Amino acid sequence: MSHLKQLRTRIKSVKSTQKITKAMQLVSASKMAKIKSQIAKSNFYIEAISKMMSDIVSIDMYELSIEEQKFFNTIPNKATLLIVMTSQRGLCGTFNYSIIKQVKYDIKELENKGEQIKLIIIGKKGYEALKMQYASYIDSYFELPKIHAENLILQVKQKIMSLVANLEVSNCVIYFNKFKNAMTQIMTRQQVLPVEKYHDDSKIENDHYEYEGKNLISNLINLYVSSQINYALLQSRASEEGARMTAMENATNNANDLISKLVLKLNRSRQAIITTELIEIIAGSEAV
């Protein structure tokens, strides 16, 4: 009988866990849908800013100041800044693994070339994975807020602008998971600075810009860096929720399979006990 009690307790426990994983799956699905909507709304703005910045360099429309040139040219013997975007929480499958693996590989490559490295890590999981081995490279660590990320974007942007302006870094690369669908996230390594040029003049021949104002280019640089961080953050968050939704769906299905096996085991155990009792009763009656 104690064995039956253990099985019932186990079934109850698994059912309780299944309710939690199902709830987490639904929450992640809801969050993912909201973030996908934000991505759709922001894509045009982000692409427009990126193209405008590239066009400035490609067609040489504006004579850049010394300070502005730092954001458009690679400066020799300066550190490479790696911005690593991971999740704050776990239970999202292999979401963080591919990012960490690529970052470690790139760090090794940069070390072999004798280049300096600085890290900005966004998200607790990335920090925990890299802090022991690369503590000397970490310049800044930012936790991901639960809801609004405006302050985070501002802080990261200010840090990047400061490092470039002070000639501490030249190249700036951001690592994040790009959202494809709930089951697929693409590990992405994207250059932020220096701003890349268009090589196909046909793409820009019909675009005509007139740049006026003392601080226009500086303001565009600020908008561009912010937009790149925002883009990566939205993609990463959508990917995280998609990965978590898929992981929780798998956990829910696994729990359902385990419950079925435990119920079958319980029924067989009960049947065995009943059969044993019947045999004892029959044997007793025959003895009488």
From Swiss-Prot:
It comes from the Bacteria. GO terms for molecular function: ATP binding; proton-transporting ATP synthase activity, rotational mechanism. It is a peripheral membrane protein. The keyword Cell membrane applies. InterPro entries: ATP_synth_F1_ATPase_gsu (IPR035968), ATP_synth_F1_gsu (IPR000131). Keywords: ATP synthesis, Cell inner membrane, Cell membrane, CF(1), Hydrogen ion transport, Ion transport, Membrane, Transport. It is found in: Cell inner membrane. Gene3D superfamilies: 3.40.1380.10, ATP synthase, gamma subunit, helix hairpin domain (1.10.287.80). It holds the Pfam family ATP-synt. The keyword Transcription regulation does not apply. GO terms for biological process: proton motive force-driven plasma membrane ATP synthesis. Produces ATP from ADP in the presence of a proton gradient across the membrane. The gamma chain is believed to be important in regulating ATPase activity and the flow of protons through the CF(0) complex. NCBIfam families: ATPsyn_F1gamma. Belongs to the ATPase gamma chain family. This is ATP synthase gamma chain. It comes from Rickettsia akari (strain Hartford). The lineage of its organism: Bacteria, Pseudomonadati, Pseudomonadota, Alphaproteobacteria, Rickettsiales.
